[in-house]
Amino acid sequence: MNELRMPNLVRPNRPLREPASRPLTPSRFPVPSQPDAAYTGSAAGSTGLGSPGPAIMDGSTSFGLVQPAPTAHFCHYCGQQGIFRCKGCKKTPYCSVDCQREDWKAHRHMCKSFDPETVGENMKESPDSDNVREDSLNIQRIYLKDLNATKYTKGAEIQGAVVEFNSPGRFFFLPEDPKVMEALMSITAEXQKXPSSTVGTPYVPCVGEVCSVQFSXDLNWYRGLIQTLAADQKTAHVLYIDYGNAENVPVERIKPLNIATKPYCPCAMECQXAGVVPIVDSWSTECCMTVRQLLGGKTLTIKLVDTLKNGRVHTVDIQLSIGKQLSTFLLEQGYAFAEAAAVGSAPAKKDPSALLEASMENFKRCCEGKDINEWAQPPEPLTLTIGDRFSVVVSHFQSPTDFIVQKVENAGVIQDLQLKLREHCSGVETQQDFRPAPGTVCCAQFSEDKQWYRAQVLAYSTEKSVCVGYIDFGNSEEVDLNHLRPISPALLALPKQAISCILAGVQPVEDSWSEECISTMLRMIANKTVNVEIQSAHKGKALVAIIEGEGYSEINVAELLISANYAAPADSNTLQQTEETTASAEPPASPPVCEPLVWSCVELPSDGQTVVLSTSAVTSPAEFYCCVGPTTDHQVLMELGVQLKQHCQSDSTYFVPKVGEPCCVKFSGDGKWYRAMVKELLGDVVKVNFVDFGHNMIVGKGCLRSITPKLLKLPFQAVRCWLAGVKPAGSEWSSEALLWFQNLVDGAQLLARVVSVSQQGYGVELESGGQSVAAALVSQQFAKPSGNLSKDPVRSPTTKQEDLRGGDQSQALTPASNDTQAVCEDGKSEEEPSEVATFSSAWKTAELPLNETFQPCVAAVINPTLFYLLHPIQNVDQQKLQEVMLELALHCSNYQSSSSVDTRPVPGAACCAQFSVDKIWYRAIILEVGEAEMSVVYADYGNSEKVPVSQILPIPTRLLQLPFKIIRCTLAGNEHFPVEWPPQVQQVFRSELLNVMATVQSFDGSANVLSLALPPERGGRNLAAVIQEMLHVHRKGSPLPDASQTPGSDATEPSCIKLGSTTASPDEPEDAAEPADAVTNTQESTPQEQKEMDQATSVHDLQGPGCCCQSLKKQMDRLEKMVQLLLSLQAEG
């Protein structure tokens, strides 16, 4: 028979819902033998043996403390019970200051000891005043640790009475001791003095605090321990420490304990029976009822065996009136068995075999001729593999080392199982001869929802009561025998859905888990979906890491508990002790020989052959990654992915990454494992390059695994290339050039020919759609021909690579740690674009939904062809933004300028800018370039300012992955717009943007194309038409230069119009949308304007500075005639 698992007896949960048991609630702790049950709340159904309240003692108690009947005082104004008195005469009662204020007109004539200053001040007092609030915040709180400890010694015999009984494992005993009686009366009298007013803001206690609490039965004040506080902070569960009973109390009836009150120890001693533990994890109802009758209303003598929990919990044995000790009685009646620990020591853990033996005795008493259900053995557990990661919900929680989860993906399976169980049990009648043996599986009816679930019989607490564990949810309860039904073989086919887990990497700070740790972890994982990753197995449970959130917002629960000092890092040797002990018994073997790691890259033919390539990662024409063929080795990569998963799931060893060495990396996007090369170590994270695809990524060290030589046999599929024969038209590749190049090569089959080879990759000539990519870049004026194109014959990348092709794989290159450079390793060259921060114009803007109409919030304007709006829909992920800000600050503080790289930015490029107010670095977009200062708009907030050139730095590509709050836009109809914009037209465009409505027409690959409509009060016209009219008027007065005009001409320069305050903080985007009046001329055209020049040339076919479209002339002529007609009509009128 399988080993019997005895979890705490709590009710099961419905499928995929919150646990039925909670920390800090009665059912959370099976109080019998656990020392940490002190002051954790009374069990449901507990009753006081003396009285229902702390201050009303039963007359049957023999020590003679009888509380006099309280005198009721009623408010002189409203008639309600009141505890305040007039400060003048000290006689007239009131319930509040408000009632005293209202009654003062009548009462002042009879108030003999009237003091005008005293009463006047009293009338002005209000609980809502700032002084009262400040005093309540500065109150000195008192906790249990501040009270004196009980001074009874071990072996002492104490006479008294049990005043509150929950179970033999938890009851409260009040000693018949004159000192205790004196302390109790002193505490009660002190608590009734000058209680705080109930009007105004109530005092909010904290969990674990000892307060003065007004008892609901007699409305007197007593010392109470705050055990739990409701989420809305309106009620608290309170344990009256001097009497042992508990209740839920509104916070209005709780006030801080007077610090002048003497710190007496709790008068009621919390006790548990010594030397015995229950048959199962909690005491049966029958046992509690029997013992309660033996203890209630009697004077008893207890013997103190031990003191636990910092002197708060006492292990005792009681001499019963029947002449037996309580422990002896419990053993004889079969309610408990003897504890294995020696007398005087802490209770030991229960032996499952002893539990099973005691249970079997109850089972065998009436099993003759019964159906004991021996065939129904528990189903197999779910198959789990190390490295698996999946979403779960927590169905039952006890502590970080004992909780149950269910897979979210199995929710439908569980629901279907419940329907089948309901149908099965509704057709099966109660069978009197059904008595399933412990360890077998049957159907059990859950007491809360009366539904049927699969359950394993754990034990027989009595002849007719059975403890069952719900195998699909993890929790358990005690049920009557007639609430069980036989199960069918079909219902046992599904594996157990409950997964028993232990949080990996943590251990208690002390001997057991603290309540703060348990409640904190439960708040993090209860009622939500979390991700778990299987790391190992320990004692039949899964060691898991719990990850909350996704991507950059991931939170490791274990790390959070450690950082909050709720847990300590686990000693890895502890969990491996069993395995090491077993291994030590075997004869020592020689250490395995580590096979060196060798790898290679796919090579491109260097003899002038033409090959088909497809891009996998594109940064710029100077750096992109390709794979040979559109689907090269696709099937091989799929098979490799399976092998990588199997390897990483079975490899649980700690991996130390080294720069220049390959490894396995889990990609957060799909959770799959890929081959990668370690590029850079950044503390707790690592920058890697996916060698089969070319992408760079920063991942945590927990996402890395070692790699084997077998997994490196397939050459790395991504080949690093650059476009040969061209170089940027300016100092760097413009944003338009980057976007144009990406759109041309992404997803296309490219014909490539290698013209040069280096350690950094291949220089290639590309053809896309029958045209040369380099020639197209030059014709679009995005690039210019390179003057240093190599004319030498094509050579192979390295001599060592030739050896690789001709020799055996065993002669391949070893990792960089062995002083040998890998063939395809990029190295850490400062010229590598992916490693060097740049003023990149290739940042991708968010796409707005098509045909959506909204009122735009303008962030910055360069011209009608290029302006920036705040995203109308997108919500900024503040956590991810903070992570980017931290990394940005680290980058800027460590940035070192390189003289070999021309870092002069261009308008529209992304950068790092230091805000002038708080001196913090932010992501920004350059609007205007000057010699001493630049105009920027802060990309995550929308405000803009001019900053010195020294406060502008290039930005790494990885910091551009999080989308900006601002979006790049262009006005619809831009194909008819000029290259250079007159300042007057730009000023009109800026002024007309107020209160316009925008409609998204398309996305042209780099910007959102918007149609802007003026408000009805301004005519409701399309803003593009207004701009066209203004351009026409300007052309007639001052013709625009054509595209062939030289850069040195005196043409009107483009203007950069900025909308936004120059002093608003990036943290306050709402205040950053005030338009500025300054219009500053730049000294050179932007790349965007150069592209518009080419477009305008192709559309209009300009032949001279005064030429324009014939259709536009006709439209303007008709407009002039209409204006003349209107003027003539007005003149006649």
Swiss-Prot record:
Q: Does the keyword Metal-binding apply?
A: yes
- For this protein, what is any one GO molecular function term? zinc ion binding
The UniProt regions of compositional bias labelled Polar residues, in chain numbering, are 808-821, 1079-1088
Q: Which GO terms describe its cellular component?
A: P granule; pi-body
Q: Which residues are listed for Zn(2+) 1 binding in this entry?
A: C75, C78, C95, C99
Q: Which PANTHER family match?
A: FI02030P-RELATED, TUDOR DOMAIN CONTAINING PROTEIN
Query: Key word Metal-binding present in the record?
Result: yes
Name where it mostly resides: cytoplasm
Q: Name one GO biological process term.
A: piRNA processing
**Bias category Low complexity: which stretches?**
37-46
Q: Which family does it belong to?
A: Belongs to the TDRD1 family.
Where is the stretch described as Disordered? 1-55, 786-836, 1036-1104
Residue limits of the Tudor domain?
Answer: 204-264, 435-494, 656-714, 904-962
Instruction: Identify the taxonomic lineage of the organism of origin.
Output: Eukaryota, Metazoa, Chordata, Craniata, Vertebrata
- Zn finger (MYND-type) ranges are 75-111
Detail which positions bind Zn(2+) 2.
C86, C89, H107, C111
Oligomeric form and interacting partners: Interacts with MAEL. Interacts with PIWIL1, PIWIL2 and PIWIL4 (when methylated on arginine residues).
What is the official name of this protein in its record? Tudor domain-containing protein 1
Localization terms from the record? Cytoplasm
> Which InterPro entries does the record match to this protein?
SNase_OB-fold_sf, Tudor, Tudor_domain_containing, Tudor_TDRD1_rpt1, Tudor_TDRD1_rpt2, Tudor_TDRD1_rpt3, Znf_MYND
Record keywords: Cytoplasm, Developmental protein, Differentiation, Meiosis, Metal-binding, Repeat, RNA-mediated gene silencing, Zinc, Zinc-finger
Q: Which Pfam families match?
A: TUDOR, zf-MYND
